[in-house]
Each structure stands twice: as structure tokens, then as C-alpha cells.
């Protein structure tokens, strides 16, 4: 039985060329606005019953696959809050610091990704078909919510699936070459 007051919120980010400023100049602002809204909702859910001491909610930001840029992986650690693992004073501090930590860490992640121009993308197909969603996003007895920020492409260079010669997990210009 899911307790309605336990929230496990996961945001899956697509670090693809959708972040390229030339292609989509306002993408960072839009993503940041969405995450800021989710952070405010998370804070509200944690404090609405005035029982922060008992609150065990969790929120995290994921990148799948994990970027090879070590700074991004380190910054992502700032985007993981699990109040079940915190004492009361830590919970209060985590909630107070959360908006600024998320804002600064996301800005730094975007900056590092844009500097490196290593568009790892997001293997959404693999994330769901290989049960990574269960591993990373599902907590028993929680209301589990997964928000995906992507341009919708399922393509990942490490997960190219071609079944029966005409069913693909991706679509590239080369795929359409008909002879």
C-alpha cells in the first residue's frame, strides 16, 4: 500500500545537443524553470503537514547514461535529496538550501556540458527497457514520479537496436538511405 504522503521525485535530464545555444537559445532557462517549480512543489510537499521530522521524501536529478565529464557527475550529487537519511536539522537545512543548490548545480552542469560539447544525450529507450527506471526511480511504498526533460529523441550511440532489419530504436539519415 502506497502512503500518499511519501514522495519520490526523479528528474531525468537529456544532455544532448538540445542544449546548444545556437539551436535552442532558451533551453537552459526553460529547464531551470521546470526544475525550480518541481523544487518548490517538493518543498511544499515536505512542509504542508507541518511534520518535517517525519518527512521521508526524496528528489533527485539523473542523467542516463552518466556523463563521462567528472565535474558533471560530482555536481549531480548536489541534486540528490533523500530526507529519510537526514536528521531533523539536516532536513531543514537541505530544504532551505535546495533552490540555490539546484540552481547553481544545474547552471554549472549546463556550462560544463556546453564547454565540452560532448552530447551524451539520454538513452531513454535503454533507461526503461533495461529496468534502470526500477533501479534508480522506484521506491517501495512511495508515490514515484519521473519527469523527463528531453527533445524526444530515443537515440543513444551505445544503444542502437535493429530488429528484423526494419525495426529500429533510433532513426538517423543513414537509416533512411534506400538503394
Residue ranges of each PLM-predicted region?
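Surface-exposed acidic, glycine-flexible loop patches that form ligand/cofactor-binding
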Residues: 1-3, 48-53, 132-140
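Von Willebrand factor
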Residues: 4-81, 85-142, 145-147
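Catalytic metal-binding/acid-base residues of hydrolase active sites
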Residues: 16, 152-153
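Short, surface-exposed linear patches
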Residues: 32-35, 82-85, 168-172
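N-terminal post-signal-peptidase region of extra-cytosolic proteins
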Residues: 37-47, 127-132, 169-178
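Ser/Thr/Pro-rich, low-complexity mucin-like regions
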Residues: 139-147, 156
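VWA/integrin I-like adhesion module and closely mimicked acidic/polar interface patches used
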Residues: 153-179
